């Protein structure tokens, strides 16, 4: 499902002494099935932007066209848009409320008017895709789970509604390295299983480099960079000027390059760096 944002501006508390422009004439197009990362320093406008795409905030001016429908129009039922655009907030485990995992995940699909068989099918599929065995976990209380497992339940609750667009606000925030890896792997599987359009908000450049196809960079309410991983992370000076950085491994390979090692500069993941460094070592061994 395509998303087109045209001249979007949002002003908090207009006309008051606390007036603040959070979005300033933003123009973005996202194609059906894209995996887009949204990055920016705290206060850059990321969260405000994603809440507009879900219809939680009303634009001060501009248009948001989702699947051909302008959701800023007064005639549009936002409840219908939210069935198509799922939003998983940061620390979504705080939104869990039911006595069992199955009931919690089933809450959304039930409100779509599905029958019991359809709801059960969606719950099982969503649990499977986030790595929670249905028979093992369905009757457990979500409050007895680890942080990473709670996060999976919360994501499954949105996924079970089978939205066309899934927005994830820092899905790996606060998790240990293993939990972080697991969640990111599940997000990749969601993209493959449902062919969703995914928008990932993240502060981690390493996470973005691993799984996103395209990166949007926000600063002071504007989208200042838009491109592939390679295109955006090659703009080191611009990123650093707005309080961001490239992945740490990129700084490492650039340091090696400056010492005249024959290694590409545009490396953004540990896996890529490992492969290139192994090539260097093997090449050095051949000359010995």
UniProtKB/Swiss-Prot annotation:
Start and end residues of each ABC transporter domain: 3-245
Organism expressing this protein natively: Clostridium novyi (strain NT)
Binding, ATP: 40-47
Protein name in UniProt: Energy-coupling factor transporter ATP-binding protein EcfA2
Family: Belongs to the ABC transporter superfamily. Energy-coupling factor EcfA family.
Subunit text: Forms a stable energy-coupling factor (ECF) transporter complex composed of 2 membrane-embedded substrate-binding proteins (S component), 2 ATP-binding proteins (A component) and 2 transmembrane proteins (T component).
Gene Ontology cellular component terms for the protein in this record: ATP-binding cassette (ABC) transporter complex
Domain of life: Bacteria
Membrane topology: Peripheral membrane protein
